[in-house]
Regions:
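Active-site beta-strand/loop signature of hydrolases that rely on acidic residues for catalysis
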Residues: 1-21, 48-49, 116, 126-135, ...
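Short, hinge-like loop/turn segments at secondary-structure boundaries
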Residues: 20-22, 65-69, 149, 180-181
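Acidic, His/Gly-rich catalytic cores of divalent-metal-dependent hydrolytic chemistry
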Residues: 194-197, 201-207
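CN hydrolase (nitrilase-like) catalytic-core segments centered on the catalytic cysteine
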Residues: 26-47, 118-197
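Short beta-strand scaffold segments in enzyme catalytic cores
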Residues: 50-52, 62-66, 100, 176-180, ...
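Short acidic-glycine loop/turn motifs at beta-strand connectors
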Residues: 56, 67-71, 181-184, 202-204
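Beta-strand C-termini and the immediately following turn/loop, strongest in propeller blades
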Residues: 52-54, 167-168
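Active-site catalytic loop in hydrolytic enzyme cores
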Residues: 55-128, 139-147, 153
Length: 207
């Protein structure tokens, strides 16, 4: 499965917090954009996990969808409110209320989006694999001087095997990075500011 970061599809700063504008940026699960993504998973035989800005009727969410073999396997909506400028937003900008696992090729997986794992770690405490798409703008110096250790520690509050994905971006600058935390420490990673794919074997995550 190819895993991408939070709000990767449109970009984390794609919203202006004016619903009349933002409703055209968000996409629903039946949109042509999502249909194309689903079709790619069937064409290439690879599942895809991506963060996106979701439209559901008249409500907008920061969501994360999983596609495999041309179908939607799972759609998770962020439960913490830090994705939005909540002093500017109205009832149209919403959070999800449900966490839960899904099964992909025999493996149980959960998703937490960025601040979810900081605000509600108790809702993600499972023994199986956790995928944690984020969007954060720390400098490499900050990451290397304690921030990465903080994220590793927070991942451990939820589970013993976590994959964290942070997208590269130029405006605002995000230095990217992908990491695997196992029982606390980082066991493999992509360096900051490098466009690359971190390949991990998660067959043991459920054992």
């Amino acid at each position: 499965m190819l895993c991408l970061g939070e709000a990767f599809l449109q970009g984390f700063d794609s919203l202006c917090w004016n619903y009349a504008v933002d409703q055209h940026m968000a996409v629903d699960l039946q949109s042509d954009t999502i249909r194309r993504l689903r079709s790619l998973t069937a064409r290439y035989g690879t599942a895809l996990l991506t963060g996106y800005i979701e439209m559901d009727r008249d409500r907008i969410y920061s969501s994360c969808a999983v596609f495999e073999s041309g179908r939607t396997v799972h759609n998770y909506r962020r439960i913490s409110r830090g994705w939005k400028e909540y002093t500017k937003t109205d009832r149209h900008y919403c959070e999800g209320t449900v966490t839960g696992e899904f099964t992909l090729r025999g493996q149980r997986i959960m998703i937490a989006l960025c601040g979810d794992l900081w605000d509600y770690p108790e809702r993600f405490r499972k023994e199986h694999l956790l995928i944690w798409p984020v969007y954060v703008n720390y400098t490499p110096e900050d990451w290397n001087n304690g921030v990465l250790d903080d994220y590793a520690g927070q991942a451990l509050t939820a589970g013993r095997d976590t994959l964290m994905v942070n997208p590269l971006d130029t405006d605002p600058v995000s230095h990217g990075g992908a990491f695997r935390f196992q029982n606390g420490p980082v066991t493999c990673r992509i360096p900051f500011d490098r466009e690359d794919v971190l390949i991990v074997d998660t067959e043991q995550a459920d054992r």
